[in-house]
């Protein structure tokens, strides 16, 4: 099928400088290529990474920038060589919309580790034009980087799974931590952390939430179903909990000591880092050596893992805790997210929003 029109003008909400303030912005989408899928956006999750990007925290931002990388929408048109999707399908798009296809990670179907991966926004596509994200009417994405949303899963529920859910699922799978009966720790109870509790519990793990204060105890235990709650500043409780956990998923995005958490791990336990921190973290080597422990990291997940994770969440009834907003609330939502004032993920109802004032 050919393209719907020669030049496709759409409206998104973009940041134009490092203040990070979003406002309506009109731009062009490329034609639907042979392997492209043209998607009308329904919902888009709001991730902490969006703030880093719109405010140029990583020093790599280009403006105007339309953020949003937890995108769920409906297929409006498919290219002539598209085999996996048809018009009317509900699909998802995550953090990546392109890769080189030739390197070891690409050939191993872990394209998120490709050194030439193309981000869904704040990047340059193969045609030389900037990529723009899901806080917009539509996107055009290569079929390789589109996933099917399972029947019966609502768009607003599916959106946060495409980043927060995947970020937790991928390392648990890769490091052989999916089997039931394991003891896991979740450090930090934000968007990724709350999905960590839910997914780990769905895998049959005994889950301990670790936090710097007692204020999220009821939330963790009563609402998210954690088995235990540990306050990291409570020395006695931390000592009692030593050598008990098979893994800890560390979602904290600011500098923090690692040694208190390394002490909680069993022999061969893994501390899996997921918070984006552009400053050195410290630990003393005996903490790792004497228990053959690992400090490792993980970055989102592959397209294959995304589809697996969505099916897993559907089968196990795993759902994100979300607050649905309209697009004109996005700047307030970012302010609240910076203060951790959300349970636990904002999702923009893009299709139900008036994008132009």
From Swiss-Prot:
Its EC number is 1.1.1.195. NADP(+) binds at residues 49, 167, 188-193, 211-216, 251, 275, 298-300. SMART domains: PKS_ER. It catalyses: (E)-cinnamyl alcohol + NADP(+) = (E)-cinnamaldehyde + NADPH + H(+); (E)-coniferol + NADP(+) = (E)-coniferaldehyde + NADPH + H(+); (E)-sinapyl alcohol + NADP(+) = (E)-sinapaldehyde + NADPH + H(+); (E)-4-coumaroyl alcohol + NADP(+) = (E)-4-coumaraldehyde + NADPH + H(+). Keywords: Lignin biosynthesis, Metal-binding, NADP, Oxidoreductase, Zinc. Zn(2+) 2 binds at residues 100, 103, 106, 114. Its cofactor is Zn(2+). Binds 2 Zn(2+) ions per subunit. Pathway: Aromatic compound metabolism; phenylpropanoid biosynthesis. SUPFAM superfamilies: GroES-like, NAD(P)-binding Rossmann-fold domains. Pfam families: ADH_N (PF08240), ADH_zinc_N (PF00107). It is an enzyme of class 1 (oxidoreductase). Involved in lignin biosynthesis. Catalyzes the final step specific for the production of lignin monomers. Catalyzes the NADPH-dependent reduction of coniferaldehyde, 5-hydroxyconiferaldehyde, sinapaldehyde, 4-coumaraldehyde and caffeyl aldehyde to their respective alcohols. Belongs to the zinc-containing alcohol dehydrogenase family. Homodimer. This is Probable cinnamyl alcohol dehydrogenase. It comes from Populus deltoides (Eastern poplar).
């Amino acid at each position: 099928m050919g393209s719907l029109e020669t030049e496709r003008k759409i409206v998104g909400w973009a940041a134009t400088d490092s203040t990070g303030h979003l406002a309506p912005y009109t731009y062009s989408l490329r034609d639907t290529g042979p392997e492209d899928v043209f998607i009308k956006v329904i919902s888009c999750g709001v991730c902490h990474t969006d703030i880093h990007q719109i405010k140029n925290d990583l020093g790599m931002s280009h403006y105007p920038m339309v953020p949003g990388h937890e995108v769920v929408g409906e297929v409006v048109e498919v290219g002539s060589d598209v085999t996996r999707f048809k018009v009317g399908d509900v699909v998802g798009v995550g953090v990546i919309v392109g890769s080189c296809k030739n390197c070891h990670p690409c050939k191993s179907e872990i394209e998120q580790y490709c050194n030439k991966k193309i981000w869904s926004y704040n990047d340059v596509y193969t045609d030389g034009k900037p990529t723009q994200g899901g806080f917009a009417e539509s996107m055009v994405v290569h079929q390789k980087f589109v996933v099917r949303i399972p029947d019966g899963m609502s768009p607003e529920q599916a959106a946060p799974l495409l980043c927060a859910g995947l970020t937790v699922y991928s390392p648990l799978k890769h490091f052989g931590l999916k089997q039931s009966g394991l003891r896991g720790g979740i450090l930090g109870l934000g968007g990724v952390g709350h999905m960590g509790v839910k997914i780990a519990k769905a895998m049959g793990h005994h889950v301990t939430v670790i936090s710097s204060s007692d204020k999220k105890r009821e939330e963790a235990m009563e609402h998210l179903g954690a088995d235990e709650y540990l306050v990291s500043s409570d020395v006695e409780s931390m000592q009692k909990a030593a050598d008990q956990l098979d893994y800890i998923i560390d979602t904290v995005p600011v500098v923090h000591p690692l040694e208190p958490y390394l002490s909680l791990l069993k022999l061969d336990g893994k501390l899996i880092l997921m918070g984006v921190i552009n400053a050195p973290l410290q630990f003393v080597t005996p903490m790792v050596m004497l228990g053959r422990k690992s400090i490792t990291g993980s970055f989102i997940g592959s397209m294959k893992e995304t589809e697996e994770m969505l099916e897993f969440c559907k089968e196990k009834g795993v759902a994100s805790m979300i607050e649905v907003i309209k697009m004109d609330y996005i700047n307030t939502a970012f302010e609240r997210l910076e203060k951790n004032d959300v349970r636990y993920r904002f999702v923009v109802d893009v299709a139900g929003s008036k994008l132009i004032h």
